[in-house]
């Protein structure tokens, strides 16, 4: 049971502690979702009263996968994938692998091994290329505008920092373009960068000739 003195102190305005209502308001502010960061088209069409899943479904941003149509859309639900017949599985055997066919009791009845792996690999590459070339029409206006933004986006040019450039100049002055020896230098390569990482850093800085100036 609460002490009457403590109860009166909490109700009094002389106390420095926040009241129960003030605490409740603070917790409500903390529970509020953060502002959406992204393209303006998403910010305009985003409904704050809906969940993320509901917004994605309304904007046409959900992938084409089987989704449960029940009242609840919680993440704990698991979607049962459609069963693939054995004949279809047999056609999709990966190169270098075989497939074991079992009956209902679990006994092995057949083992499928592709004899012509090279031909299957070439056919699979052709199918994949055809799938990549097939354009998918956007279903909503939001998706169309997002695709236009993605098509017009330019790559961000990265620049080396002054300290990174100074360090690379020391390596180039000592080893020239021999990145293998740069990676092995324990004194200069204090960050233990690999040969590939050093190559990418030199390329980002403008190349060996730019670092020699």
From Swiss-Prot:
Repeat in keyword set: no
Family, similarity comment: Belongs to the NOP16 family.
Biased composition annotated in UniProt, kind: Basic residues: 1-14, 22-34
Record has Transcription regulation as a keyword: no
Biological process annotations from GO: ribosomal large subunit biogenesis; rRNA processing
Disordered as annotated region, ranges: 1-42
Subcellular location per the Swiss-Prot or TrEMBL entry: Nucleus, Nucleolus
Quaternary structure (record): Component of the pre-66S ribosomal particle.
Protein's name in the database: Nucleolar protein 16
Gene Ontology cellular-component annotations: nucleolus; ribonucleoprotein complex
Organism from which the protein derives: Cryptococcus neoformans var. neoformans serotype D (strain JEC21 / ATCC MYA-565) (Filobasidiella neoformans)
Entry keywords, A to Z: Nucleus, Ribonucleoprotein, Ribosome biogenesis, rRNA processing
Function text: Involved in the biogenesis of the 60S ribosomal subunit.
InterPro entries: Ribosome_biogenesis_Nop16 (IPR019002)
Pfam family, one: Nop16
């Amino acid at each position: 049971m609460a002490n009457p003195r403590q109860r009166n102190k909490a109700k009094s305005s002389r106390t420095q502690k926040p009241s129960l209502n003030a605490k409740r308001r603070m917790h409500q502010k903390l529970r509020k979702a953060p502002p959406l960061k992204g393209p303006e088209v998403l910010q305009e069409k985003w409904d704050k009263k809906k969940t993320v899943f509901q917004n994605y479904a309304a904007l046409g941003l959900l992938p084409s996968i089987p989704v449960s149509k029940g009242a609840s859309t919680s993440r704990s639900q698991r979607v049962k994938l459609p069963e693939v017949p054995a004949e279809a599985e047999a056609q999709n055997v990966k190169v270098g692998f075989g497939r074991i066919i079992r009956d209902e009791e679990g006994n092995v009845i057949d083992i499928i091994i592709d004899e012509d792996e090279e031909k299957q690999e070439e056919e699979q590459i052709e199918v994949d290329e055809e799938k990549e070339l097939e354009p998918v029409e956007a279903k909503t206006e939001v998706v169309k505008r997002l695709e236009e933004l993605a098509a017009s986006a330019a790559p961000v040019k990265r620049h080396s920092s002054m300290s990174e450039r100074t360090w690379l100049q020391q390596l180039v002055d000592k080893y020239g373009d021999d990145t293998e020896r740069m990676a092995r230098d324990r004194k200069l390569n204090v960050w233990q960068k690999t040969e590939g990482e050093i190559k990418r850093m030199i390329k980002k800085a403008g190349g060996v000739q730019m670092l020699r100036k």
